[in-house]
UniProtKB/Swiss-Prot annotation:
Membrane topology summary: Single-pass type I membrane protein
This protein's UniProt keywords: Calcium, Cell adhesion, Cell membrane, Disulfide bond, Glycoprotein, Integrin, Magnesium, Membrane, Metal-binding, Phagocytosis, Phosphoprotein, Receptor, Repeat, Signal, Transmembrane, Transmembrane helix
Stretches forming FG-GAP repeats: 29-80, 81-138, 335-386, 387-442, 443-503, 504-560, 564-624
Transmembrane segments: 1085-1105
Basic and acidic residues biased stretches: 1140-1159
Glycan attachment sites: 33, 86, 185, 646, 667, 723, 859, 894, 929, 1056, 1067
Gene: ITGAL
Covalent S-S links between cysteines: 71-78, 108-126, 650-704, 768-774, 842-858, 994-1009, 1017-1048
Localization annotation: Cell membrane
GO cellular component: external side of plasma membrane; integrin alphaL-beta2 complex; integrin complex
The protein's name in its UniProt record: Integrin alpha-L
Native source species: Bos taurus (Bovine)
Lineage: Eukaryota, Metazoa, Chordata, Craniata, Vertebrata
Protein residues bound to Ca(2+) 3: 587, 591, 595
Extracellular compartment spans: 24-1084
Region (Disordered): 1123-1165
Length: 1165
């Protein structure tokens, strides 16, 4: 079991920045490392800064011995620390602690083992060493357990004084019988002596050998009832009972159990019993005071807390054997009947340690069945007091209390100690104890439990006095095996609030290292950054090859984010377990800067802190104001030389670490920028640059530099000053590792983590006359608004025009506010020519800023609207379809500026009203099935029924105030002299009553369509209406000549046009049907047909006579055709040549007429 505890401890800190390390403020470029190859890979397991050097612990590996090594930064060498001891120390260096008040060193080996009757006892070996490592060395064995296995000769020395009642006396006898019976089969021998004024041996070892029956041996015991001569009784037992002739064994362990109810009535010494293990049991009411209890200590073996037991009643004697059973072994975790558990046999005392003001404590994780506890060491290390769980419960078993211990300094009267039990109930626990500083019993005051199983909560503890006032404000509790959010390990911060520590926050490492062991080492550093607050370092040895985080102190606690993360590989390749141990409270280099020692596998790295500095800067201008004439547009046409402004910048470095003694030089990179917050700068350095970058070396002596800048022409913003910003940072060259012996060499400083920026402003001159006070007079009016009407079409827009004048001096930050109704939506604003160069920008104010309306805020000619200036502003709006409108909309405008007197505000406002017209969306058309043509003939019917059908579609309106609609239907006029007459009626769906009205006759009777009657029909807002015009057309005379007439009807939708308009124009709500009437005149045609037939026959006869005369009917066409067939049937021979052309044309029917013609014309060949 001893190996398990120590190996676990090694693993927790063994193989155990935010990207690569930030540079604040440990120097990772110039480091020093120490190693001692023969010490093995555990060299660096523990590091402590002692005196002017570093003490390194190197527990053993394999069968080698552990040791301490002293490393001197001045020489770079490490040498073993010589300790005179008769003990082999395998794990020496596993535990180191230093006293911050005296610098003494406490070094412990928790694995000191020895054999006791074939069993292994495990306790500690500790050394208290002077800070120079050469002075006297005190040696102690905390938790050392006497070996009482093997042969044991045990004597009961029991009180027989008169203060004992008979029943109490009998209970003592029963207790002795019970012990003897339970140990009857062991290697124990017993004897018993009653003491009072005199001493009487009740039975000897020889008697017990002969007769092992306790009842028989103690049957004759009689109560003596006299005084209590304890000193004499002890000497009597040593001389007269432990005698070989009375059965005592020479090789047996001598044990004396003293049972008494009062203080001794005699005085003497007990030197004769110094080789006897003495237990004393005080029973009864006589031991209530501290003095009476301490009186028993002189009779007991050391440590007295292990060998003195106080019982308030005699009834508790019967349960006391359970404690005696602790001297009989049982394997951890088992429970065998009649066997006992461990007490201090496997205490591993010294697995942790702390030292403060000469008061040392060491952890004893194996005590009390590995419930654990700690030992309060006396100054000489020879004795100690065990403190553990009170009361000792089953739950605390195997909790490893004492795995870590740390003092929590306090200015009060009580000493405060925290100790961890990382295996308590698998989640871990930390207990806080207190003790009066003048000495006295320990008392447990607080329990803090972990939350995650297996996290090893309490595996590392650290008290932090943030403001260094002697009072511990923070308790840091590590859980290096905690897992969450891909982070391995966590440190919980508990703050002392009144009398208890309460959790306030936590620290954690970088993501991506679930096994990083963040918190395996925690160290409260001295102030390394010059803010006079304690800083903290946290090790994570398994984040890659190891990392160390630096958390700076802040008022009331620690910064939640690290100021620096240092990876071991930044300094040395191949490094392992960097951050397994940390200590940083001293200046090892003699330069006034704190150094931090960090343990790794087989080596120790010493990191030097860098001097933290602040740069004192100053910026001034000459002249103090920018001349306005240099930025006016007219200045560009002149040949005047630009005067510009001289800018003076001064630097001075100041160290924030008062102890720093080196030469201070800061290599500074600075940047000067003009109007850096603007896209276009109003100031320019030579070469047209708005930014200058430079380098300089800064010392504590003030140094200044002068720069010149000028201005571009036509600057519009002449109100706000030009911003001049100075930013700076430090730069350093890559260098070789700094030799700590070269104290006169400059140490590169580092800037404190604050904004390294200074901003100054240089204003413009004000052109406001001699009094330098500009007074403006603004006037605002709407213009060109008489013909404005807002027609609410779907894409309706509205433009309003404002005229703004300034009749006095320059106006600063002119702002026009325009209120408009909810139904309008701002689209854009523009300046009308010839003032288009004047800038204007508008934005709509939040709706909560205005009530029942909306508003625009427009900046005009920002920031200056010059004297005697005028500008026309056109603002354009879109309309919202679902807006609420009245008959008019009202717009209100107001103008203001920063420098107009209140008596001149009368003409700063303007109001206008614009009529609103609402759309009517009505579409009408005639139907295809209307009658478009009729005809009258003498033989046709005299009456025709006709119909004209119209369809009316009315689209729903988005507005509520719709007017009444009328359908106006007009029908044709009846001409009194015409051949036809007609009658008309109106039919509508849905039905309505229409009222007819005669129309006046048109002046032009020849008009194609003439209307005589108009029907007025009220209609509702329905989606569709059908209108049918029915007519009867009658022929009332005789048709004497053919003619064509047109009869027309029309439909129009009418409404009040003063507030409404046709959305798609008036024509869209009108339709007309034109019907043609054909009058056909018919004559008698029979005689014409007869004469035409006779003429046709006569013409045919004349044609026949002509054909006969020319011989058409006399040709022998048939014979010619047959001859031609015969000729074509002949087959020519193979050698027949090409046919002759003359032979091809022998057809008489074809050629005869031509030949005849030739003969007639030429007379032949």
């Amino acid at each position: 079991m001893n190996s398990c505890i120590i190996v676990l401890r090694l693993l927790l800190s063994g193989p155990f920045v935010f990207a690569p390390a930030w540079s604040y403020n440990l120097d990772v470029r110039h480091v020093q490392n120490f190693s001692f190859p023969l010490a093995g890979r555990h060299f660096g397991y523990r590091v402590l800064q002692v005196g002017n050097g570093v003490v390194v612990g190197a527990p053993s590996e394999g069968n080698s011995m552990g040791n301490l090594y002293q490393c001197q930064p001045e020489t770079g060498d490490c040498l073993p620390v010589t300790l005179s001891s008769n003990y082999t120390s395998k794990y020496l260096g596993m535990t180191l602690a230093t006293d911050p008040t005296s610098d003494n060193l406490l070094a412990c080996d928790p694995g000191l083992s020895r054999t006791c009757d074939q069993n292994i006892y495990l306790s500690g070996l500790c050394y208290l060493i002077h800070e120079n490592l050469r002075g006297p060395v005190l040696q102690g064995h905390p938790g050392y357990q006497e070996c009482i296995k093997g042969n044991v000769d045990l004597v009961f020395l029991f009180d027989g004084s008169m203060s004992l009642q008979q029943d109490e006396f009998e209970k003592i006898v029963d207790f002795m019988k019970d012990v003897m019976k339970k140990l009857s089969n062991s290697s124990y021998q017993f004897a018993a002596v009653q003491f009072s004024t005199y001493f009487r041996t009740e039975f000897t070892f020889l008697d017990y050998i002969r007769q092992k029956d306790p009842d028989a041996l103690l049957a004759g015991v009689k109560h003596m009832r006299l005084l209590t001569n304890t000193f004499g009784a002890i000497n009597y037992v040593a001389k007269e009972v432990f005698r070989p002739d009375l059965g005592a064994r020479p090789d047996a362990t001598k044990v004396l159990i003293i049972i008494t109810d009062g203080e001794a009535t005699d005085e003497h010494n007990i030197d004769a019993a110094k080789d006897i293990i003495r237990y004393i049991i005080g029973i009864g009411k006589n031991f209530k005071t501290k003095e009476s209890q301490e009186a028993l200590h002189q009779f007991a073996s050391k440590p007295v807390e292990e060998f003195v037991k106080i019982l308030d009643t005699f009834e508790k004697l019967k349960d006391l054997f359970t404690e005696l059973q602790k001297k009989i072994y049982v394997i951890e975790g088992t429970s065998k009947q009649d066997l006992t558990s461990f007490n201090m046999e496997l205490s591993s005392s010294g697995i942790s340690a702390d030292l403060s003001e000469g008061h040392g404590v060491v952890g004893a994780v194996g005590a009390k069945d590995w419930a654990g506890g700690f030992l309060d060491l006396k100054a000489d290390l020879k004795s100690s007091t065990f403190v553990g769980n009170e009361p000792l419960t089953v739950e605390s078993r195997a909790g490893y209390l004492g795995y870590t211990v740390t003092w929590l300094p306090s200015r009060g009267t009580m000493s405060l100690l925290a100790t961890g039990a990382p295996r308590y109930q698998h989640v871990g626990r930390v207990l806080l104890f207190q003790q009066p500083k003048r000495g006295g019993p320990w008392s447990q005051i607080q329990e803090i439990d972990g939350i995650q199983i297996g996290s090893y909560f309490g595996g590392e503890l650290c008290g932090v006095d943030v403001d260094r006032d002697g009072e511990t404000e923070l308790l840091l509790i590590a859980a290096p095996l905690y897992y969450g959010e891909q982070r391995g390990g966590r440190v919980f911060i508990y703050q002392k609030i009144q009398l208890e520590f309460q959790m306030v926050s936590e620290l954690q490492g970088e993501t991506g290292y679930p096994l990083g062991r963040f918190g395996a080492a925690i160290a409260a550093l001295t102030d390394i950054n010059g803010d006079e607050l304690t800083d903290v370092a946290v090790g994570a040895p398994l984040e890659e090859q190891g990392a160390v985080y630096i958390f700076n102190g802040q008022q009331g606690g620690l910064s939640p984010r690290p100021s620096q993360r240092i990876e071991g590989t930044q300094m040395f390749s191949g490094i392992q377990w960097f951050g397994r141990s940390i200590h940083g409270v001293k200046d090892l280099g003699g330069d006034g800067l704190a150094d931090v020692a960090v343990g790794a596998e087989g080596q120790v790295i010493v990191l030097s802190s860098r001097p933290v500095v602040d740069i004192i800067t100053s910026v001034s201008f000459s002249p103090a104001e920018i001349p306005v004439h240099e930025v006016e547009c007219s200045y560009s046409t002149s040949n005047q030389k630009k005067e510009g402004v001289n800018l003076t910048v001064c630097f001075q470095v100041k160290s924030l670490i008062s102890t720093f003694q080196g030469h201070l030089v800061a290599n500074l990179t600075y940047t000067l920028q003009l109007d850096g917050h603007r896209t276009r700068s109003r100031g320019l350095f030579p070469g047209g640059k708005h930014k200058l970058i430079g380098n300089t070396a800064v010392t504590p002596v003030k140094s200044c530099f002068v720069f010149w800048f000028h201005f571009p022409i036509c600057i519009q913003d002449l109100i706000s000053p030009i911003n001049v910003s100075l930013s700076y940072s430090l730069w350093e060259e890559e260098g070789t590792p700094r030799d700590p012996r070269a104290l006169d060499r400059d140490i590169p400083p580092i800037l404190k983590p604050s904004p390294h920026l200074e901003t100054k402003e240089i204003p413009f001159e004000k052109n406001c006359g001699e009094d330098k006070n500009c007074e403006a007079d603004l006037k605002l009016a709407f213009s060109d608004m008489r013909s404005k009407i807002l027609r609410l079409t779907p894409s309706a827009s509205l433009s309003v025009r404002l005229t703004l004048r300034n009749t006095a001096e320059d106006a600063y930050w002119v702002q026009v506010t325009l209120s408009f109704p909810q139904g309008l939506s701002f689209r854009k604003v523009e300046i009308l020519k010839p003032h288009s160069h004047v800038p204007v920008g508008c934005e709509e104010l939040p709706e909560e800023a205005v009530v029942h309306s909306r508003a625009l805020s427009c900046n005009v000619s920002s920031p200056i609207f010059g004297e005697d200036s005028m500008v026309d502003i056109q603002v354009m709006f879109n309309t919202l379809q679902k807006g609420s409108w009245g008959d008019f909309i009202e717009l209100q405008a107001n103008v203001s500026c920063n420098n107009e007197d209140s008596s001149l505000l009368e003409d700063n406002s303007a109001t206008t009203s614009i009529p609103v017209m609402y759309p009517i969306n009505v579409l009408t058309k005639d139907q295809e099935n209307s009658t478009l043509y009729i005809s009258f003939t003498p033989k046709s019917p005299k009456i025709h029924h006709v119909k004209h059908i119209y369809q009316v579609r009315i689209q729903p309106s988005n507005y509520d105030n719709m007017p009444p609609l009328e359908a106006l239907v007009r029908v044709p006029r009846v001409h009194s002299e015409g051949l036809i007459t007609h009658k008309w009626s109106i039919q509508m769906e849905p039905p309505v009553n229409c009222s007819p009205r005669n129309l006046e006759s048109p002046s032009d009777e020849a008009e194609s369509c003439s209307f005589g009657t108009e029907f007025r029909c009220p209609i509702d807002f329905r989606q569709e209406i059908l209108v049918q015009v029915n007519g009867m057309v009658e022929l009332r005379g005789t048709i004497k000549a053919s003619s064509m007439l047109s009869l027309c009807s029309s439909l129009a939708i009418s409404f009040n046009s003063s507030k409404h308009f046709h959305l798609y124009g008036r024509n869209a709500s009108m339709a007309q049907v034109v019907m043609k009437v054909d009058l056909v005149y018919e004559k008698e045609m029979l005689y014409l047909y007869v004469l035409s037939g006779i003429g046709g026959l006569l013409l045919l006869f004349l044609i026949f006579i002509a054909l006969y005369k020319v011989g058409f009917f006399k040709r022998n066409l048939k014979e010619k055709m047959e001859a031609n067939v015969d000729a074509s049937s002949e087959i020519p021979g193979e050698d027949a040549g090409q046919p002759e052309l003359e032979k091809e044309c022998k057809d008489p029917g074809c050629l005869e007429p031509l030949q005849k013609t030739d003969e007639d014309g030429s007379g032949g060949d």
